[in-house]
Design a protein with these regions (language model features):
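Short linear loop/turn motifs
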Residues: 20, 27-28, 118-121, 229-235, ...
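Pocket-lining segment of extracytoplasmic ligand-binding domains
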Residues: 109, 127-219
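Amphipathic, soluble alpha/beta structural segments
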Residues: 50, 54, 64, 70, ...
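Conserved C-terminal helix/tail region of periplasmic/extracytoplasmic solute-binding proteins
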Residues: 253-293
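Short, glycine-/small- and polar/acidic-enriched structural segments
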Residues: 1-125, 129-135, 139-145, 158-168
Length: 293
């Protein structure tokens, strides 16, 4: 959402930038970034971890979501965690934040996939996961707050709010390569500033109507109650000082190791995944405070 707003409100232009916003599933986005086709991405720390352990130089410079802020939506008829036993749950890509959210969420519900005969299916991107749920290919899946309202509007109720568990987890952040940061420091700083201003615009109550209109347009929501829920969830998601959360990254590394997703994650420190230098500069110069004045 901060990127949509930064684009629509001309914030990028104020920094002499005109980025093309492209929706690509996170795993493919990272591949494109490694290839040099894309310079920036909003990706989870799990994808950065996979890139780093494979020898890449990707790093996270802003932290946009520092907890697992997902909702579990289910097909009609599923009323409790017990009803999920023997069912199929879509997890997106095997090593993404959505997969991690699913593991943690099922654990919070007292469920163990193998013991409870829950089949975890790699359903791909968010639109593909939605289609699988709507068509009956899966029985449940976790969705982020914006998309959850679309799923709810289609008649698939929310069973569990993982965000209320407050699990520290760097679910999303602004990612680029360390090489690009060194070669293009002004572009990196200006793009980060524009994204931060976009987030501050979303969080400012005076801009609520503009933000709600953007949500309605981009997510094709029309019911006022759904729009209000989506707005509230989005406005509350991004920290006022969106720096990478080292504790949240440590949680990512631990979960990836525990679930056998990437054993090499155990060899890394949070600082191997995040570059805090730009955030420190913006904090020291008072930028974070100024955008919220």
């Amino acid at each position: 959402m901060p990127l949509w707003i930064a684009k629509e409100q001309g914030i990028f232009r104020r920094y002499n930038l005109d980025p093309q916003l492209i929706y690509i599933i996170a795993g493919r986005a990272m591949q494109s970034m490694i290839a040099g086709d894309i310079q920036f991405g909003l990706l989870g720390a799990s994808h950065v971890t996979n890139a780093v352990t494979a020898g890449g130089d990707m790093t996270m410079l802003l932290g946009m979501e520092d907890k697992l802020n997902y909702f579990l939506n289910v097909r009609p008829g599923i009323k409790s965690a017990e009803d999920l036993k023997g069912k199929k749950v879509g997890i997106g890509t095997p090593s993404g934040s959505l997969a991690m959210a699913t593991y943690v969420g099922l654990d919070q519900l007292g469920l163990v996939p193998r013991r409870d005969r829950i089949t975890l299916l790699n359903t791909g991107s968010t639109p593909e996961r939605m289609s699988a749920l709507f068509a009956g290919g899966i029985d449940a899946a976790f969705f982020n707050p914006e998309v959850e309202q679309v799923v709810l509007q289609q008649g698939f109720p929310m069973l569990f709010d993982l965000g209320k568990a407050n699990v520290p987890y760097q679910a999303s952040g602004l990612v680029t390569s360390r090489k690009y940061m060194r070669s293009n420091p002004l572009i990196v700083e200006n793009l980060a500033k524009a994204v931060i201003e976009g987030a501050a615009f979303v969080q400012n109550p005076a801009n609520k109507k503009t933000v709600v209109d953007s949500i309605a347009r981009n997510l094709r929501l029309d019911r006022p109650d759904r729009l209000e829920s989506a707005y509230r969830a989005i406005a509350d998601t991004v920290p006022r000082k969106p720096c990478p959360n080292l504790a949240g990254i440590a949680s990512v590394l631990k979960l990836m190791t525990q679930h056998g997703i990437n054993p090499k994650a155990a060899e890394l420190k949070p600082e191997d995944i995040a570059d805090m230098s730009l955030c420190k500069k913006l904090d020291d110069t008072g930028f974070f405070n100024r955008v919220h004045q």
